[in-house]
Amino acid sequence: MEKVCKASDVPKAAMKGFTVKGRQILLANVNGSFYAVDAICSHMNGYLPSGKLEKNEVVCPVHRARYDLVTGKVVKNVPAVMRLATGGGAKDLQTFKVKVEADDILVDI
């Protein structure tokens, strides 16, 4: 497990991007529970921490693919016309185990 930040660095209903061991991850605080997933959208490499956090889902700022932060699964894919134009849609994100020790957030990368 790698220390990423302090719990206080990511307030409730917020998310931030971090680079851990060369990998870009998104860390989100959903009602005091922390979730970590890949920070890059699998559709066209949008930076998910710049997107929108809605409950336990993140919406990509580029083409609005929506991912579940708990499972990493695609909840809503990009529009069909966009999938046709770009050769495919969004794929599930990798999730990472998160542990809170005192005020430290640790992620299993």
Where do the PLM segments sit?
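N-terminal pre-ligand scaffold of iron-sulfur
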Residues: 1-55, 68-69, 73, 86-109
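Short cysteine/histidine-rich metal-coordination sites, predominantly Zn2+-binding motifs
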Residues: 55-61, 74-83
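Short cysteine clusters
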Residues: 41, 60-63
